[in-house]
Design a protein with these regions (language model features):
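A conserved pocket-lining segment of Rossmann-fold NAD(P)-dependent short-chain dehydrogenase/reductase
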Residues: 110, 165-171, 215-240
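Conserved Rossmann-fold NAD(P)-dependent oxidoreductase catalytic core, especially the SDR/UDP-sugar
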Residues: 126-174
Length: 370
């Protein structure tokens, strides 16, 4: 996994928590779940390099590769399934004061289906938060959540704020799991008001190293789109996602925060910029087209993902900048272009020609309008 390039995000310097005691109380012992996944692994490596942190404990149910273990540096790896009560012993014996829960998965494991995934996600979170509640040393819990909790609907607001409810709450898949997990995290905050619970709703992530449903969907030579729809996409560069998690871990700012890049990209623009060929199909036919793409290894689209590809989703990130004090380095368009470059996608249609035609069209429209 290549993580070269700009390190993700930066503090804005105008956070309202900068003068508070929370900003001065850095974590001493941090436990990171999902440490063998992209975000958990790289976050562990970053935190292990921070001299302000005394100890980092990386937890996952599978053993890390030699390369990942080397990248974790001085962090201690503990092989544990967070669904097992053993996680409480790890937290208690390690005198952990900060827990970063980054283990929730959006795709089903090879063995088992949707039911297994839900158990991994929801039951794992329940057991972990119960362990945090019982551990007097725990003072911070950071939850990696997702913008998918808002769903996607043709009647959605232009921007989702953290206080906006979904018009039609997701009823299945990773989005439903994330809604449930957030609920358990808020329950922990009510039962232990001395714990600062931070929930980060990450926009759809993309980048050269991270494998996501969206990156696989856009990697095929032909990209099916819903006829008559052009989704508005707000993205988040993989390095900015890491930066936001790191910022939340160090800042200890309680609350729920939308995390996304500035600007949007339309689905049609994304397809053109990557040199793919769009294939408009009726919404009802997307399932059949996806079955063919699945056979050629590109992706699998569930109901919530189909809604996202039809309508998109954009969040208001004012609270992220002003209260969390974090600002992503990559805009949505820059994040997408970095994904295209980093993946080495061979254009079916030269994007430079497409952009040239777009520029000429804009110039012509301006001349006609003047």
């Amino acid at each position: 996994m290549n993580s070269e390039g700009r390190s993700g995000g930066r503090p804005t310097g105008n956070s309202s928590d900068s003068a508070s005691g929370d900003a001065l109380h850095y974590p001493k012992v941090v436990l990171v779940t999902g440490a063998c996944r992209f975000l958990g692994g790289y976050l562990t490596a970053r935190l292990a390099q921070n001299p302000l942190i005394n100890h980092v404990i990386a937890v996952d149910a599978i053993a890390p590769s030699k390369d990942l273990l080397r990248r974790m540096g001085r962090a201690e790896f503990v092989r544990a399934d967070i669904r097992n009560p053993f996680i409480a012993k790890v937290i208690r014996n390690g005198d952990v004061d900060t827990v970063v829960h980054a283990a929730a998965a959006s795709y089903a494991p090879r063995s088992g289906g949707r039911a297994t995934l839900k158990e991994l996600n929801v039951m794992g979170a329940i057991q972990l938060f119960a362990a945090c509640q019982k551990a007097p040393s725990v003072r911070r819990v950071i939850l990696k959540s997702t913008s998918e909790v808002y769903g996607s609907n043709p009647h959605d607001p232009v921007l989702f704020t953290e206080d906006t409810s979904a018009r039609r709450p997701p009823g299945e898949g990773f989005a439903r799991d994330s809604i449930d997990i957030e609920g358990y995290a808020r329950g922990l905050a009510r039962r232990r008001p001395d714990i600062a619970v931070t929930i980060l709703r990450l926009a759809n992530m993309i980048g050269p190293a991270m494998d996501t449903a969206l990156s696989r969907f856009l990697a095929g030579p032909v990209v099916p789109t819903v006829f008559g729809r052009d989704a508005r996409l707000q993205l988040l560069h993989e390095q900015d996602a890491l930066g936001a998690l790191e910022r939340a871990t160090m800042a200890g700012k309680a609350g729920t925060f939308n995390i996304g890049a500035s600007g949007i990209i339309m689905m049609s623009q994304a397809i053109r910029r990557s040199g793919r060929i769009p294939l408009p199909v009726p919404r009802s036919a997307m399932w059949a087209v996806d079955s063919l793409r699945r056979a050629t290894r590109y992706t699998e689209v569930d109901r919530e993902q189909l809604n996202y590809l039809s309508y998109g989703r954009v969040m208001d990130t004012t609270r992220m900048r002003k209260e969390l004090g974090y600002s992503p380095k990559w805009t949505t368009v820059e994040a997408f272009d970095d994904y295209v470059r980093g993946r080495g996608l061979t254009p079916i249609i030269d994007p430079r020609w497409v952009r040239s035609m777009e520029s000429r069209a804009v110039s012509a429209a301006q001349r006609w309008g003047s």
